[in-house]
Amino acid sequence: MTTHAPFRVDHVGSYLRPKDLVEARAKFANGEITREKLTAVEDKEIRELVKKQIAAGLKGVTDGEFRRAYWHLDFFWGFNGIEHRVGKHGLKFNGVETKADTATLTAPIDGHNHPFVEHFKFLRDLVKDEDVIVKFTIPSPSQFYFELIFTPENIAAWTSVYPTEKELFEAIKNAYVDVITDLYNEGLRTLQFDDCTWGALADDGFIKRFDADRPLEEVRRDFVGRALQLNNSVLGVLPKDLVVNTHVCRGNFQSTWIAQGGYEKVEDELLAGEYVNAYYLEYDTDRAGDFKPLAKVSDGKKVVLGLLTSKFADLEDKDEVIARIKEASQYVPLENLYLSTQCGFASTEEGNILTEEDQWKKIALISEIAQEVSGK
């Protein structure tokens, strides 16, 4: 068996939260149950989820992000020096707004004793006798940086601790290396950086929000350079036998989106320059553009085409998906192409607008298509 992701039948990582878990999290938030009781429910539901993933033929299993409210913020809150705060408003998606939670830097940061290490160890022990590996997902370093600069309040907070951006970057790098080293020492060999910054940087509207006074492309190049520098500063010092892949999307909250724009605007940095093994790329709608930027993918790197949507229940036409895979093979060799949904089924605890049965039908369709394309 291949010992790391991607796999021919693959997924991004998050799954719809079961009813019992949703209820337990609500009770914990209201002070009705203890942390220990919530953890017991989480453990139970993760065990069931792993069984379902294995039954569906997935070889890289996750915990569904069942211990998180958000795909990214819970990880940030695990750093020493970061506080969970509530801002003035949430992120405005297409027709809906998230809760106003944020991560604010209030003291020098480090990644020692990060709670996600225990999350990994539970999953590791759960599958130790199975013919699968653990794929562990965390937000990218660049995603952390963009959280810290997204509001004036967060900017004021970090600049009171780190006088320069150079010092902040070094602190972020070291904090990430702290956590990843601990994960590696506990046995992790496949890590996934989830990263919405590239999708935002491909969107002209987002670029204008970062800096409306300078020329748009000048601002884009500036921030794209920062994202690449920060991610590679971490990737470049990790153990060689730790496989790190990255997932790029344009927002996934209650079946809506937040950004649009093709990869051509970030292709040199993302597809040619980032030190990752594989790219999980959103491609379920025209908002992601065409396949031409894939020509920039470095030799030997793998691309997981997110051609099926995790946002809605309707199943894609198998022949159309196969035709798109063949189209993409003009730019990346077919043996280096893989298939998944464009994102997870529940990037936040609210989840997308489909049922648990629907999400497994999507995985089954991925399996069917992958077998037909590979001939196995």
Indicate where each model-derived feature is located.
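Domain-level signal for soluble alpha/beta catalytic cores
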Residues: M1-K376
